[in-house]
């Protein structure tokens, strides 16, 4: 059975444990999703499911996508995601998926796009230490040296420098499911997940749980 679903980050909140400890939680709208394509090793070279989530107006869908989704017959979706899995042929096109693909206590990975912070310096982006701020110093927030000398004569790849902060695909691993409410398409997860409110996330069962 599939152990992944597309959803939407709703908001963060907190609940209180029996000992009074405040536990941070994230509410995720998990589904409903629809299977839009079943890929098999014989035809496609690998086994996977393509699932759709959300809705989109017909005027915002191009002709190739309309032709693809008209075969499903359940409207047009906001996003499509492909999930590799064994025995994908056990599912059918048009099948609906809900939050009950997960259970309370399961560990999951949540994949999303982090909040974009724009162009940022090394202090905000990487946590660099500031330079001296007194006695005529002029390098309070400068990054400092970026290389060596004649050798190697270049800036090494991966050097931490100013640039775009955030707006990147990120995976938060091994989060625990606190509650599952299939009738509300709701997952309650302990901890934070990447992205802003109403951001699209992919939830999958982790393979890193201890």
From Swiss-Prot:
Gene3D superfamilies found in the cross-reference section: 3.30.160.810, Translation factors
Ranges where the record places region Disordered: 126-167
InterPro entries tied to this protein: Ribosomal_uL3, Ribosomal_uL3_bac/org-type, Ribosomal_uL3_CS, Transl_B-barrel_sf
Pfam family, one: Ribosomal_L3
UniProt keywords, alphabetically: Ribonucleoprotein, Ribosomal protein, RNA-binding, rRNA-binding
UniProt entry tagged with the keyword RNA-binding: yes
Regions of compositional bias (Basic residues) in chain numbering: 156-167
Molecular function (Gene Ontology), one example: rRNA binding
UniProt record, GO biological process: translation
Disulphide bonds in the chain: none
One GO cellular component term noted in the UniProt record for this chain: cytosolic large ribosomal subunit
Subunit relationships: Part of the 50S ribosomal subunit. Forms a cluster with proteins L14 and L19.
Family: Belongs to the universal ribosomal protein uL3 family.
Xref: PANTHER family: 50S RIBOSOMAL PROTEIN L3, LARGE RIBOSOMAL SUBUNIT PROTEIN UL3C
Function: One of the primary rRNA binding proteins, it binds directly near the 3'-end of the 23S rRNA, where it nucleates assembly of the 50S subunit.
Protein name: Large ribosomal subunit protein uL3
Species whose genome carries this gene: Syntrophobacter fumaroxidans (strain DSM 10017 / MPOB)
Lineage: Bacteria, Pseudomonadati, Thermodesulfobacteriota, Syntrophobacteria, Syntrophobacterales
Gene expressing this chain: rplC
């Amino acid at each position: 059975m599939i152990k992944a679903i597309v959803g939407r980050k709703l908001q963060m909140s907190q609940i209180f444990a029996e000992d009074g400890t405040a536990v941070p939680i994230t509410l995720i709208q998990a589904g409903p999703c629809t299977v839009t394509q079943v890929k098999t090793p014989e035809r496609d070279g690998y086994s996977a499911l393509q699932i759709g989530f959300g809705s989109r107006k017909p005027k915002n869908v191009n002709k190739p996508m309309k032709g693809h989704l008209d075969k499903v017959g359940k409207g047009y979706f906001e996003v499509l995601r492909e999930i590799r899995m064994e025995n994908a042929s056990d599912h059918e096109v048009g099948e609906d998926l809900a939050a009950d693909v997960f259970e309370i206590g399961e560990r999951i990975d949540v994949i999303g796009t982090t909040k974009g912070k724009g162009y940022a310096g090394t202090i905000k982006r990487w946590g660099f230490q500031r330079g001296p701020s007194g006695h005529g110093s002029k390098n309070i927030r400068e990054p400092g040296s970026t290389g060596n000398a004649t050798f190697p004569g270049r800036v090494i790849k991966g050097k931490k420098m100013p640039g775009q902060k955030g707006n990147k695909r990120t995976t938060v691993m091994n989060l625990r499911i606190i509650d599952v409410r299939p009738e509300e398409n709701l997952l309650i997860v302990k901890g934070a997940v990447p992205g802003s409110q109403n951001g699209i996330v992919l939830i999958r069962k982790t393979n890193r749980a201890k």
